[in-house]
């Protein structure tokens, strides 16, 4: 297979919205070439969305070796002021998309736009984008104030205005008294606040964050999650945030793009992503999820019947199954399952055996064997009247059909 022709794509300006547009014509074909008719239909839709998008990826592809794609036909648009998180496992393509937006990687095909303007050929330092990294990237030989002054000096901002902007940025992150210190004299959380202030000091419309809280302890990480989110909304800036931490994604974002194998598997607000996953990957990657394997025996509209592999039949909501006889993976969240349930006549009831009962402070976590699955989890609140189950104990489990989703096997 021939090598892909490089097309220079430097970073995006501030306030981006994400899209992805497909390959351009050239003498050589990309590793995968989209169907022309489908491409034209999608391109028409993308053009319409691009008119209102602040950040847009339009059919963007990325290959490092000219053979395989690490980002595949990515189409993503963001309105101004949105906080969007790119979430996925290692190698899913999320960080590559962020780097293309910043201008540190070039798109092999497709176009990236900021506020309606193509930025593929704009170098990173001219895109006007603020960036925050996990390693802070502070200059150790400079004071905090000097670190914040650097991006302002590059932009040739005068001394009096620089001082005003530095003070305002430090006050925003509650670090106004630390301007004279060096990074080595600060804690990890303080350094991250300074890194955030430096990204905001020149007032960008778009800020990119690459695993910014990954090196911090749990308590500090949770505190900064809320600070960053509140600050972004207060300032009205657009944020593209990359993480593999599901909790960060669900608590901080207006929308989450779940990546796998170079594609967005689902793009949705956090509650929709968790409550209504569109495929088995998203269901299992976001939060904790119980699965039962089976075969569709009936399907009509928004309801189907699934025969589990142990022979029992249950009702479910069909998501991406369409035919009788199709194999499916039933998805049920642990908190939607009750032990010895009182859910009414519509509830599904299955026999189960307790394998493990774990005390977790505010909740109990019970692992059971259900319909051939020995790792079926039930989460219950720690109440004064809570009965503590014992390994080997036989119990009945129940859940409502609306909480049961039939996904791709």
For the regions a protein language model found, what residue spans apply to each?
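Non-catalytic connector elements of ABC transporters
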Residues: 36-39, 289, 299-409
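ABC ATPase nucleotide-binding domains
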Residues: 124-130, 134, 138-284
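Helix-to-loop junction immediately C-terminal to a conserved catalytic motif
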Residues: 102
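Conserved coupling/switch loops of ABC nucleotide-binding domains, chiefly the family-specific signature
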Residues: 108-111, 161, 261, 293
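Conserved ABC transporter NBD signature motif
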Residues: 110-118
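The feature captures the beta-strand-to-loop junction immediately N-terminal to the Walker
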Residues: 87-89
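ABC ATPase nucleotide-binding domain
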Residues: 56, 77, 113, 396-398
């Amino acid at each position: 297979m021939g090598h892909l022709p490089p097309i220079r794509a430097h970073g995006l300006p501030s306030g981006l919205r994400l899209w992805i547009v497909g390959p351009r014509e050239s003498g050589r074909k990309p590793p995968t070439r989209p169907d022309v008719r489908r491409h034209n239909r999608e391109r028409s839709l993308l053009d319409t969305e691009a008119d209102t998008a602040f950040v847009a990826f339009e059919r963007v592809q990325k290959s490092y070796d000219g053979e395989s794609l690490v980002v595949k036909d990515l189409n993503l648009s963001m309105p101004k002021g949105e906080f969007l998180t790119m979430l996925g496992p290692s190698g899913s393509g999320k960080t590559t998309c962020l780097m293309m937006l910043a201008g540190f990687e070039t798109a092999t095909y497709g176009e990236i736009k900021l506020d309606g303007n193509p930025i593929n050929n704009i170098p990173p330092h001219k895109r006007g984008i603020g960036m925050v990294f996990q390693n802070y990237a502070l200059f150790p030989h400079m004071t905090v104030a000097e670190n914040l002054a650097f991006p302002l000096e590059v932009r040739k901002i005068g001394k009096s205005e620089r001082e005003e902007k530095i003070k305002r940025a430090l006050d925003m992150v509650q670090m106004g008294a630390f301007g004279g210190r060096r990074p080595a004299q600060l804690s990890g959380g303080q350094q991250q606040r300074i890194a955030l202030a430096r990204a905001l000091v020149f007032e960008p419309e778009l800020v990119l964050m690459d695993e910014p809280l990954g090196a911090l302890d749990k308590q500090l990480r949770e505190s900064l999650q809320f600070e960053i989110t509140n600050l972004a909304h207060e300032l009205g800036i657009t944020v593209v945030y990359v993480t593999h931490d599901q909790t960060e994604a669900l608590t901080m974002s207006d929308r989450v793009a779940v990546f796998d194998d170079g594609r967005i598997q689902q793009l949705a607000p956090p509650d929709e992503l968790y409550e209504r996953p569109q495929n088995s990957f998203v269901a299992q990657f976001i939060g904790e999820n119980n699965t039962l394997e089976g075969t569709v025996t009936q399907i009509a509209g928004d309801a189907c019947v699934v025969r589990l592999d142990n022979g029992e039949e249950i009702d479910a909501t069909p998501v991406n199954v369409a035919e009788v006889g199709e194999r499916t993976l039933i998805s049920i969240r642990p908190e939607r399952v009750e032990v010895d349930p009182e859910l009414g006549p519509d509830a599904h009831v299955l026999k189960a055996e307790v394998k493990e009962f774990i005390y977790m402070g505010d909740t109990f976590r019970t692992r059971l064997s259900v319909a051939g699955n020995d790792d079926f989890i039930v989460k219950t609140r720690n109440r004064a009247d809570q009965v503590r189950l014992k390994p080997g104990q036989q119990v009945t489990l129940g859940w409502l059909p609306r909480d049961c989703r039939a996904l791709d096997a």
